[in-house]
Amino acid sequence: MPESYEKWNSVKTAWNDILRSYETLTAPDSFARHSDLVQQVEELIIHGADETGLTLDSEIQSYYTMKLITQELPALIEGTAVIRGRGNGVLAAGTLTDDIKLELLLEAAQSDKALINLMQSLSRIAELNRSEDGELLQKGEQAAGNIRNYLGVLDQEIIHKQAMSMNPDAFFAQGTDAIASASEVFQLAVTLLEQTLQERI
């Protein structure tokens, strides 16, 4: 898989560049670089799935598990991270500019779409009624609920709040918790997919 290898090297280079310059970066530059890195990782995941044929998998369970790994969960994790960072800055400044409001609304809309797709994938996996999928389904629903609640906080405390009063650290912490719950589902999905693929060997 030479193309995936090249993309992996690009990701490693970008990450090492961030590590070397982290202490000297401004907050906006650091945020932009981390966002670019996440985008590269997402592209690497999808490209690797395409090269191995997993995105065309004929078995429904592994197909929807792969969708969780390559599409829905990365989109939710990245979207929540953007909302967490931007929202934290807005609450700290006490001002919501039109540009940032538009960015937050777009991220929220994309997250809503990813949540719908996530629940559809979990629903299809649940239809198979496999005992080994139980934890994934439970944690997946919890993560979806956490992110949905976070989007609600964004709407109530930032987008439609005239006088913002929420503690920025509290908003950031809730976002971190939502990301952690989605990351846990990601790891469970990866483990489940590995087990499924091993069963075919």
Task: Tell what function each PLM region has.
Residues 1-201:
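Hydrophobic alpha-helical segments
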